[in-house]
């Protein structure tokens, strides 16, 4: 390893080793990758005490740094969350290997037999904030998809990430795969991020996972293609034909289950026909649950509601706060969402099939939901085992980015001495 003070040399060394490892990993068997991931899961559980101790150092660092309660929640690991990491690793291990899957095949009049086959991307750089579990999720998904990965976690999660990375390395060793297939940048120096964004000779794609500031920095300065995971400005629209119980259950879960995740609801739009009934009931229960409501003036609700300002529309709180507004129609709700959303996840609560069809047709978020909590906007809940993030762009990957989304394809063309006329 190069001197940690010489960041360009450090990152070039990491890049070279990642590229070499990617070439080996691309041809690794499905059984090897499955073995590596299960061995990593075993190591994480066996070393949970060490991981929690490392996390305690990060929590102290975060408190000293003045992190918000939402960021501290994202940073914290306990035995239950470590069990979640283990389960995620095993779920990815159990998935079908995407590499080598035949996506399409056909025969041309010339006699050429053509197959389109899934292949790894190569080397993926993942830049993320706070959540140490991303170390495991990203490492697992890149390994499953035959990609080498360079992980650059947040400065506040360095000790936790190092402990989890050690378990991934143990899994690679157990399966006789190159340890350089999953590397963690071993410094908090931000210059390492700048280097990673420009390593076109070694890195094939960058995946940023974090707040608007991080994603914006990556999009501005990266010379490598980017899968953008923007903030989750998530809307729920309560239609005039909403079912009361479904509305209450879905909205409360979408806002309060975990307030600091990107799938948490941030804005509630209520049709004026139900504002005095279902809408008020939902707002009353949110307030009783400790949620601070920033509402448009005149919206029926609890006395504790604050008057919303223009800054509340299009805001990702990541906290026990929600904006609320009355709308005259589904058209007004869709117009509001189009103006303020981040194309992440939006939801309609209704029993009207025509309203669902209009909502799904006229909005273009990566995930659109009907009568379901937006906290299901998660790769694990989509059956992907885990996710690197929710891609909100429109190129290549969109929605939860799992192992399959971390692949490309190539064409295999077979002839029999075939020549072109």
Curated annotation (Swiss-Prot):
Annotated localization: Cytoplasm
Class of this enzyme: oxidoreductase
Main localization category: cytoplasm
GO MF annotations, alphabetized: glutamate-5-semialdehyde dehydrogenase activity; NADP binding
Gene Ontology biological process terms in this record: L-proline biosynthetic process
Listed pathway(s): Amino-acid biosynthesis; L-proline biosynthesis; L-glutamate 5-semialdehyde from L-glutamate: step 2/2
The protein, known as: Gamma-glutamyl phosphate reductase
Keyword terms, alphabetized: Amino-acid biosynthesis, Cytoplasm, NADP, Oxidoreductase, Proline biosynthesis
GO cellular component, one term: cytoplasm
Function statement: Catalyzes the NADPH-dependent reduction of L-glutamate 5-phosphate into L-glutamate 5-semialdehyde and phosphate. The product spontaneously undergoes cyclization to form 1-pyrroline-5-carboxylate.
InterPro entries: Ald_DH/histidinol_DH, Ald_DH_C, Ald_DH_N, Aldehyde_DH_dom, Glu-5-SA_DH, GPR_dom
EC number from the UniProt entry: 1.2.1.41
Keyword Phosphoprotein: no
Catalytic reactions on record: L-glutamate 5-semialdehyde + phosphate + NADP(+) = L-glutamyl 5-phosphate + NADPH + H(+)
Family named by the database record: Belongs to the gamma-glutamyl phosphate reductase family.
């Amino acid at each position: 390893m190069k001197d940690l003070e010489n960041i360009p040399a450090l990152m070039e060394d990491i890049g070279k080793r990642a590229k070499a490892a990617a070439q080996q990993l691309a041809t690794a068997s499905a059984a090897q990758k499955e073995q590596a991931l299960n061995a990593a899961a075993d190591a994480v559980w066996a070393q949970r005490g060490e991981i929690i101790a490392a996390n305690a150092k990060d929590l102290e660092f975060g408190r000293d740094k003045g992190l918000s309660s939402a960021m501290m929640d994202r940073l914290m690991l306990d035995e239950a969350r470590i069990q979640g990491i283990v389960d995620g690793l095993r779920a990815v291990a159990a998935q079908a290997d995407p590499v080598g899957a035949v996506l399409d095949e056909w025969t041309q009049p010339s006699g050429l037999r053509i197959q389109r086959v899934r292949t790894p991307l190569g080397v993926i750089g993942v830049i993320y904030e706070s959540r140490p579990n991303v170390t495991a999720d990203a490492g697992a998904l890149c390994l499953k998809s035959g990609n080498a990965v360079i992980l650059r976690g947040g400065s506040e999660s360095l000790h936790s990430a190092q402990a989890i990375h050690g378990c991934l390395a143990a899994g690679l060793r157990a399966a006789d795969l190159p340890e350089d297939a999953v590397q963690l940048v071993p410094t908090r120096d931000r210059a390492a991020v700048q280097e990673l964004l420009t390593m076109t000779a070694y890195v094939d794609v960058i995946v940023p996972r974090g707040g608007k500031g991080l994603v914006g920095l990556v999009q501005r300065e990266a010379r490598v293609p980017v899968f953008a995971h923007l903030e989750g400005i998530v809307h729920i629209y309560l239609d005039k034909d909403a079912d009361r119980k479904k509305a209450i259950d879905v909205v409360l879960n979408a806002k309060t289950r975990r307030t600091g995740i990107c799938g948490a609801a941030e804005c509630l739009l209520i049709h004026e026909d139900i504002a005095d009934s279902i809408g008020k009931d939902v707002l009353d229960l949110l307030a009783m649950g400790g949620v601070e409501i920033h509402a448009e003036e005149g919206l029926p609700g609890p006395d504790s509601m604050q008057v919303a300002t223009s800054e509340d529309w299009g805001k990702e709180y990541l906290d026990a706060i929600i904006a609320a507004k009355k709308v005259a129609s589904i058209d007004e709700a869709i117009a509001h969402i189009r103006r303020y959303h981040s194309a992440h996840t939006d939801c309609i609560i209704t029993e009207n099939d025509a309203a669902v069809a209009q909502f799904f047709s006229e909005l273009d978020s990566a995930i659109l939901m009907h009568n379901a909590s937006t906290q299901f906007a998660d790769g694990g809940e989509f059956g992907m085992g885990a996710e690197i993030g929710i891609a909100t762009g429109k190129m290549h990957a969109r929605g939860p980015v799992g192992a399959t989304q971390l692949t490309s394809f190539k064409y295999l063309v077979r002839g029999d001495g075939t020549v072109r006329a």
